[in-house]
């Protein structure tokens, strides 16, 4: 029976050193040499690692592999944004590259689909299949760098920032998230500053408390409502951890974090006549008064079948100005890649839904039960 090869992209530095010493009977520094080839030079062929002796190269060829997701489709936006469908087995996840001057941000997925049911997000409507492995998370970054070009001649980084804001809820994949983040920060990995790696969560308090004890990166929270009643309606996770539980966990995290400089980024998607009234703005201002933050308003990005609409520019402007009257720093996110469905909330991929959510949504639609209202569909 043929033994499956070990994918070296599944190891952070500590894990790779252990694998080399315990499984390959090699010195730990050899693991670090290989890491540098993989992440600094984008090499996936052991034969190209010319400072590794032939015996070790043969051992690696026999027992190991370096396999990242492959691009099955690429779409290019007029604004320079690129959306890649990346193959992870027989399914696809979506990864988005957003260039902006000297800054180049990669939006990375953490799950195939999403286990949560946020009503305004197209990813949620696809259902959920599984968590991504470490190699499939960091492999998106590795593959994107290859696609863009490592630009060795100029010395410029092809990717300066990573945001865990793609498909899925990162904190429901803690086992693979933490080593993935370690590789992003590691000098022998992608060597990113902890302030340039951002994890966004919808409110998985247990996961955020684990992050507090294990990793320091920038944090963004998907809040999207100023009270529990409304948040539970559009984000069912609020029934498990309510707003006060969530914010208490956020305060614990930023108190222990250097990456956040004492503040969290609050993400608030604006849904026309749902959560964008001036009373909502004032309620949000009051809610956040004990949690140091900056607020990022996200005008809703439509997708087929959604019951929601983007607010008018005047409503967005009034909402922002109301918050600013309370001395908050408030930005409105510039929509990027919406012409290729690469904007916030539009990622769908190709998901084999294990929750049966997509089948239930289709049945409800055919029975005329949606009718433009917020639907309440539970996974089975």
UniProtKB/Swiss-Prot annotation:
Its main location: cytoplasm. One of its GO terms (biological process) is rRNA base methylation. [4Fe-4S] cluster binds at residues 114, 118, 121. Residues 100-339 form the Radical SAM core domain. Its cofactor is [4Fe-4S] cluster. CDD domains: Radical_SAM. The active site is at residues 94, 344. It comes from the Bacteria. It catalyses: adenosine(2503) in 23S rRNA + 2 reduced [2Fe-2S]-[ferredoxin] + 2 S-adenosyl-L-methionine = 2-methyladenosine(2503) in 23S rRNA + 5'-deoxyadenosine + L-methionine + 2 oxidized [2Fe-2S]-[ferredoxin] + S-adenosyl-L-homocysteine; adenosine(37) in tRNA + 2 reduced [2Fe-2S]-[ferredoxin] + 2 S-adenosyl-L-methionine = 2-methyladenosine(37) in tRNA + 5'-deoxyadenosine + L-methionine + 2 oxidized [2Fe-2S]-[ferredoxin] + S-adenosyl-L-homocysteine. GO terms for cellular component: cytoplasm. The keyword Zinc-finger does not apply. Disulfide bonds join 107-344. One of its GO terms (molecular function) is rRNA (adenine(2503)-C2-)-methyltransferase activity. The keyword Cytoplasm applies. Its EC number is 2.1.1.192. PANTHER family: 23S RRNA METHYLTRANSFERASE (PTHR30544), RADICAL SAM CORE DOMAIN-CONTAINING PROTEIN (PTHR30544:SF5). Specifically methylates position 2 of adenine 2503 in 23S rRNA and position 2 of adenine 37 in tRNAs. m2A2503 modification seems to play a crucial role in the proofreading step occurring at the peptidyl transferase center and thus would serve to optimize ribosomal fidelity. Reaction proceeds by a ping-pong mechanism involving intermediate methylation of a conserved cysteine residue. This is Dual-specificity RNA methyltransferase RlmN.
């Amino acid at each position: 029976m043929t033994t499956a090869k070990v994918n070296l992209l599944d190891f952070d530095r500590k894990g790779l050193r252990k694998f080399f010493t315990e499984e390959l009977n090699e010195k730990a520094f050899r693991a670090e040499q290989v890491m540098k080839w993989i992440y600094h030079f984008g090499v996936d062929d052991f034969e190209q690692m010319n400072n590794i002796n032939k015996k070790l190269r043969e051992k690696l060829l026999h027992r190991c592999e370096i396999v990242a997701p492959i691009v099955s489709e690429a779409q290019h936006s007029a604004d320079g944004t690129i959306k890649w469908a990346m193959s992870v087995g027989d399914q696809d996840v979506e990864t988005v590259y957003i260039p902006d001057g000297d800054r180049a941000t990669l939006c990375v997925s953490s799950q195939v689909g999403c286990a949560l049911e946020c009503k305004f997000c197209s990813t949620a409507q696809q259902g959920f299949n599984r968590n991504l492995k470490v190699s499939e998370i960091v492999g998106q970054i590795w593959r994107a760098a290859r696609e863009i070009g490592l630009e060795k001649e100029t010395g410029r980084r092809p990717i300066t920032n990573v945001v865990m804001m793609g498909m899925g809820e990162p904190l429901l994949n803690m086992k693979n998230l933490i080593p993935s983040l370690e590789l992003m920060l590691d000098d022998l990995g992608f060597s990113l500053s902890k302030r340039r790696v951002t994890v966004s969560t919808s409110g998985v308090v247990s996961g955020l408390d684990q992050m507090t004890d294990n990793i320091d990166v920038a944090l963004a929270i998907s809040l999207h409502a100023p009270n529990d009643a409304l948040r539970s309606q559009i984000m069912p996770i609020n029934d498990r951890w309510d707003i006060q539980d969530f914010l208490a966990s956020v305060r614990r995290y930023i108190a222990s974090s250097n990456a956040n400089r004492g503040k969290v980024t609050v993400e608030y998607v604006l849904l026309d006549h749902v959560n964008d009234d001036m009373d909502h703005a004032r309620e949000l201002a009051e809610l956040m008064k004990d949690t140091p933050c900056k607020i990022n308003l996200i005008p809703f990005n439509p997708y087929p079948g959604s019951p929601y609409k983007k607010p008018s520019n005047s409503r967005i402007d009034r909402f922002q100005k109301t918050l600013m009257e309370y001395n908050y720093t408030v930005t409105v996110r510039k929509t990027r890649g919406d012409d290729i469905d690469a904007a916030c909330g539009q990622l769908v991929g190709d998901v084999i839904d294990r929750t049966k959510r997509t089948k239930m949504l289709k049945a409800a639609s055919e029975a005329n039960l949606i009718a433009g209202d917020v639907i309440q569909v539970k996974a089975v």
